[in-house]
């Protein structure tokens, strides 16, 4: 067929290829490796109870923040444990100036998925054989929990909605503090080091706040 015997891909693609029969079931060859991995990455290479690959890495989300800006606003990011506390912090940071925001909303679909999952959402369901897919974005409790929270921040003008993600201006915001924090994967420090080097020493990381 011209396809490689072994290929690297993102976890989300495993079901897409497995449903079509494009991946080889290697369950019998990998059962001994289960305890080597944490549950999340191990589950990510499975579909319908079968294993189709081995995890290579994991990018757990974390709360990255500009300590200099948070200190200026009188906010201790380490004490932000809930989304309500994050909302309160957003108001204090925006009070520093009209161009200061706790974070930006770039419209990233992956961010939406991650945050709704954090709230316990399961809006996408598949049948055991993968032949049927159910999408429930309007009634899922976790989706509503996140969208209500995020919409409140948007309605009150507490998020930067004008700066495109991964743009030069976006990284500039990381440097000058006008974009003061990120909920993102643990891989972001390398990006900050390369594209926002002038902000070195200002950024810290802590655990993600949750809905309650």
Which role fits each region the language model picked out?
Residues 1-37, 72-74, 81, 172-173, ...:
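Extracytoplasmic "Venus flytrap"/periplasmic binding protein-like
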Residues 73, 148, 152-159, 195-212:
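Extracytoplasmic/periplasmic substrate-recognition and gating elements
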Residues 77-83, 159-167:
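Short beta-strand-to-loop elements that line the ligand-binding cleft
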